[in-house]
Amino acid sequence: MKRIISSVSFLCGFALVAAVAHSSSHEFFKGKSIRLLVGNSAGGAMDDWARFVAQYLGKHIPGNPDIVVQNMPGAGGITAANYLFNIAKPDGLSFGIVNPALYSDQLIGSKEVRFDWPKFVWIGSPEKIDQVLFIRTDFPSKTLDEMRNAAEPPRCAATARAGLAYFLPKLLEEALGIKINMVLGYGGGGEMNLAMEKGEIHCRAGTVSAYVGREPTRTWIKKGFVRALVQSGAKRYPKLPDVPTFYEVMEANKTPEATKRLARVLLSSGDLGRPIIGPPATPADRVQILRDAFTKAMSDPALLADAQKRRWDLDLSSGAELEATAKEIMVQPPEVIERMKKLLLEK
């Protein structure tokens, strides 16, 4: 009988401790502010999505904390990622939306990297970010085939070497032999759009959803200022049915299998989307609260109505899905990494 009483007492005590811990974790966020860093400058799609999510996320977190968005551009997003990994307190109050292709910097051994990609805490992503490469219509070459023999290569913008905006044009060079002059150092999509308007650049890659659904590109399309050349997804985006995928282009040009594998590694960053990540060692209970809140926020009728009004498409990834992808993508054979180094490091 004593053993039974002891067992019951233990279970009751365990349940009480668990209940207190649960209550404590839910009370933690009350009266506090969560800082959401953006690894890009203001005015681009990454910044817009961060501010969009921030409007709705807080009310689905117990305690209804404020969500404060702060831009931290630099080194193509590495600055923000390094900060989150090494400096931000792992207390559940600091997170960020960062460039999903930063894993490529780690794979090729970039000296600037001070993080281990799979060890971040992963909360979720509101959309996948397959890209479309678009160019000003006043550029003389009208097609990819014509660009092969262009008298002057087009100038194409990107924030840095780690990112689909850089990967897609460079993969065209690798697969088709098209020469493209990359212009790096832009803080985000807003700066690149302004440079395109001024004629500083001819082309850039951006997300397919932003290209058809956001300004200024939505108006540019209507006015015939730009045209789409190729998109990065495995399938054609429904709103760009006449624009070939890069995979279709590779098949049509009988691209070698080694180049196809390189393309798959680089373009898969689109599956990570616009990941919300946090510092390693963030308490698991707080991570789960934030993951649950993200899922609830993404189904909030007010958010869905706002997204529809903006003509934005949601394509969610859970924190668990992002975590699995992040771990998988870091396991690459030496020959792929060497090809990546050649593509991303050689000028």
Q: Language model features by range: what are they?
A:
Residues 118-126, 179-185, 216-269, 318, ...:
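Short beta-strand->loop
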